[in-house]
Amino acid sequence: MARSHDTKGSGGLSQRQLRVGEQVRHTLAQVLQRGEIRDDLIERTVISVSEVRMSPDLKIATCFITPLGSADPQAVIKALASHAKFIRGRVAPSLAQMKYMPEFRFRPDTSFDNFSKIDALLRSPEVARDLSHDDDEDGGADEAPRNGDE
């Protein structure tokens, strides 16, 4: 599931960056799901890998993660970062076609928080009032005259 994190430059991401990022995301999610990383915090936390963003040279993989439950995101990120070389070795077989294995960087995925803030704003009474007011104004003007009503 792609997230809308800020990108540098106006070109966006290339097809290769997107393809490799998705391949890394899928493999990383499998490594986490199988419990291959021997760390108490990582083993007892369900971690969702929502996106992996590759650098233009494909040497850096920025992984956006969300720990599900009550786990502290920063503690989980710190634990994952301490096992980055092990993770790199586990992901390497799925990226055998690449010249270099990417360096892993872990970041919290804040897109869900942003979506919930936007949802709360859209559900606020002020917005509902404005939307109903706009509907009332537009409702009469948009109707086409019927035969005999002119």
UniProtKB/Swiss-Prot annotation:
Source species: Brucella suis (strain ATCC 23445 / NCTC 10510)
Location(s) in or outside the cell: Cytoplasm
Family recorded in the similarity comment: Belongs to the RbfA family.
A Gene Ontology term for the protein's cellular component: cytosol
Full protein name: Ribosome-binding factor A
SUPFAM superfamilies: Ribosome-binding factor A, RbfA
Top-level taxon of the source organism: Bacteria
GO molecular function, one term: ribosomal small subunit binding
Gene for this chain: rbfA
Keyword line: Cytoplasm, Ribosome biogenesis
Record flagged with keyword Cytoplasm: yes
Function of the molecule: One of several proteins that assist in the late maturation steps of the functional core of the 30S ribosomal subunit. Associates with free 30S ribosomal subunits (but not with 30S subunits that are part of 70S ribosomes or polysomes). Required for efficient processing of 16S rRNA. May interact with the 5'-terminal helix region of 16S rRNA.
InterPro entries (alphabetical): KH_dom-like_a/b, RbfA, RbfA_dom_sf, Ribosome-bd_factorA_CS
Pfam families given in the database record: RBFA
Keyword Cytoplasm: yes
Subunit structure: Monomer. Binds 30S ribosomal subunits, but not 50S ribosomal subunits or 70S ribosomes.
GO biological process: maturation of SSU-rRNA
Main localization category: cytoplasm
PROSITE patterns according to UniProt: RBFA (PS01319)
Region (Disordered) location: 126-150
